[in-house]
């Protein structure tokens, strides 16, 4: 991922140095397990632990000749520990024993950051949902005014989705926080299963029940799919804020700092650039998920077609989502909200948004629903097309007069009556 979208902690996990450090840790732990079994001398394991190191440039130099990254890594480490201990590094292992176990450890760390980010987003949504619990606004369906809701309910809806995202990410973490040290085709042909158990336990990983040369890639696909779904949540939130920030709507908008500029040409502009960035990056995440699905099918006990893909999508997807979550947390925390504009827009249609309330009242009073629907719709369309007053038309309708008084009609135009169950909904979240 480009530095512009990389936050330090997540970027460190996927740095080349950290990847090699993690691989060295796997090799070191494997040698310790082998020493416990009596397969290699304890002194050799001690030397590997104390002297094990590498030079990244040296690894690259060796790889130019070997064209094999793991062999180059093992050779470079061997130069630090000396020939006597070097012959015991990587004993009984295949490259992906080290690579996949290190990758599982790194993915676990990345998931931990993402889960923490999601929890922080949940908290800021919860705080702002409580703040705007009773703030009325128009609810829109198909982009058209529907019925009143509250801005707090909108925020609570997002909060509920983030709760599910946390559960999804925790499940994905469990799926990828695994390791395998079972040899060339997964049969432990030249290594004792104890080594796998020992290494995984030290790293906080779960040994896979069965593997080929590699950990199966449905696990990685699940993580990338989860990342894409979480990205979809952030996309949804950002897209809604963008709509609410439209000039003709302006019910909410991103924070705009005093020295911020919106356009190189138009000094008046206040653009939702952060939300636009979130929406754009969500597209990347969906593309990464598709690539992960393609990685699931490998030849026989393993081919290497997945490797080049994962070198891009795993760092990029986790780094991108980490950055997007940071942007979303900041956006919600500083979101500018305009309750007066919300109320003005709620009344924009002259009461059309209470048409269902009128219809329901008529049916409750004994009117046939289809007939009542036609009566109310007639006056609604006159409001839409001719600008006639909706309430006046209803009160003058002889059919409606049979069932409702003018006072009863007026009472139907109270938005707060339609929001009487807000407390019930919010109580589900402890708000």
Task: Give the predicted meaning of each segment.
Residues 1-22, 62-66, 266-431:
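Glycine-rich cofactor/substrate-binding loops
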